[in-house]
Amino acid sequence: MKPNLALRAACCALIGLAGCTNLPKAKDYSTALGEPQSQLQQDPNWSGGRIWVRPGPPIGSQFDKKLLMENVTYIPGDRPDELNFRDNAELRQRVLDYMNAALRREFSQAGYQLISAPAPRSVRLRAAITGTFRNDRDPRPGEYVPIGYVLGQTAKAAGLRDQSARLLIEASARDATTNQLLIASMGAVTGSNLPESRKPTAADVQGAIDDWARRVREQFDRIWVAEIPKTP
């Protein structure tokens, strides 16, 4: 590797690691979900995720695994929309249809009961895509990819990687009867590699959606028995 290229690669690696502790602040997000983003904490089990859990006893002590799922939406804000969800209605709908099916499949297969109307001890789940990105190619397995690095696009600026399709997705869980907020989640996930000249398709983000659905379901599994992480 040429010296100048090696230096650039090293700098990008350092910037990426710096993102581990330099996650985007709440003011950097525009979403209609209205959750307490300033209180979101790094999820210790998901480098690309942040989470908030209502203080108090474990969620599972007061709620059954009954979910009232609302249809996933796309919320345009001041976050990048590099996959053109805002203007491409067909692409957006294909992605949302796949996402709704993936989320329902993930939770039902894990033993959650999906209901169609509010019931005692049930939870309402909402989710929205709030940012789309074409940035540096997904690193090799095992590389750490914090949200700050995903959104910062540092390696893309250096021209060292191909591009990948990425999504920023936010979700909330509320008491289906009282609407009290129980869980707020935000995560960045990576789909297929995208040549710079090719337009994105729904297939390019299906892997990212499957990953996100699994990650959120795993968050719920852990939260149902013990709240993580603790709010300082």
State where each predicted segment sits:
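C-terminal/domain-edge helix-coil "capping" segments
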Residues: 21-55, 159-168, 172-232
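N-terminal segment of the mature soluble domain
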Residues: 61-126
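Bacterial N-terminal signal peptides that target proteins for export
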Residues: 1-10
